[in-house]
Structure formats: C-alpha cells, structure tokens
UniProtKB/Swiss-Prot annotation:
Protein name: Small ribosomal subunit protein bS20
Protein source organism: Caldanaerobacter subterraneus subsp. tengcongensis (strain DSM 15242 / JCM 11007 / NBRC 100824 / MB4)
Highest taxon, organism lineage: Bacteria
InterPro entries registered for this protein in UniProt: Ribosomal_bS20, Ribosomal_bS20_sf
Family note: Belongs to the bacterial ribosomal protein bS20 family.
SUPFAM superfamilies: Ribosomal protein S20 (SSF46992)
Keyword terms of this UniProt record: Ribonucleoprotein, Ribosomal protein, RNA-binding, rRNA-binding
GO cellular component, one term: cytosol
GO BP, sorted A to Z: translation
Gene coding for it: rpsT
Annotated NCBIfam families: S20
Molecular function GO labels: small ribosomal subunit rRNA binding; structural constituent of ribosome
Length: 105
C-alpha cells in the first residue's frame, strides 16, 4: 500500500482527464476551506483576547463577529452546524460568565 502525503502526489496517479479535473477542484476547495477555517479561528481568538479588557461593549461586538463568522462557515459547508453550535455555546458561556462576574463586583 502506498502512503500519499499530498494532493500533488495523487495528481501523479490520476490517469483520466476527469480525475485530473477533480484533483484541481479538490485543491481549490481545500484552499478555500483552509481560508474560511483560519478566519473563524482568528475571530474566536480576537474574542478570547478581548475578554481580558473587561470592556463589555467591545467584547459583545467581538462575540457578534465571531458568531457571524461561524454561521458563514456553516452556510458555506465548511463546518457542520453542530460544530458551530458547540463553539458558539462555549463563546456565549464565557461571555455570560464575564457578565455575571462583572455584576457581582
């Protein structure tokens, strides 16, 4: 059994024209998916970094943007809806914990 490390190595194995076309499509979609996932991670990271500022309005805006980006990824088929729901739930839990601690102070 041959172990392939990348799509380029698979490209060498493609014999038919349609297989080569499919490989090109896969490359394009893989790149698109990586970009979208990277964007989602960036927005989540920015939200987590903003939690340290304790500025509720700024945090709320970052939360809104992160949720929006997660929803976009779901609509484009990059993330499963349950994955996005789980990530949003964690974000809201952090936000609500911050609100609760802020109201206790």
């Amino acid at each position: 059994m041959v172990k392939l490390n990348s799509i380029e190595e698979v490209d060498l194995l493609a014999n038919t024209k349609s297989a080569k076309k499919r490989i090109a499509i896969i490359k394009k979609r893989t790149l698109r998916n990586k970009m979208i996932k990277s964007r989602v991670k960036t927005f989540i990271r920015r939200f987590n970094e903003s939690l340290a500022t304790k500025d509720i309005e700024a945090i709320k805006e970052r939360l809104r943007l992160a949720v929006k980006e997660l929803d976009k990824a779901v609509s484009k088929g990059v993330l499963h809806k349950n994955t996005a729901a789980r990530k949003k739930s964690k974000l809201y839990a952090k936000f609500n914990a911050l609100l609760k601690s802020a109201s206790n102070e």
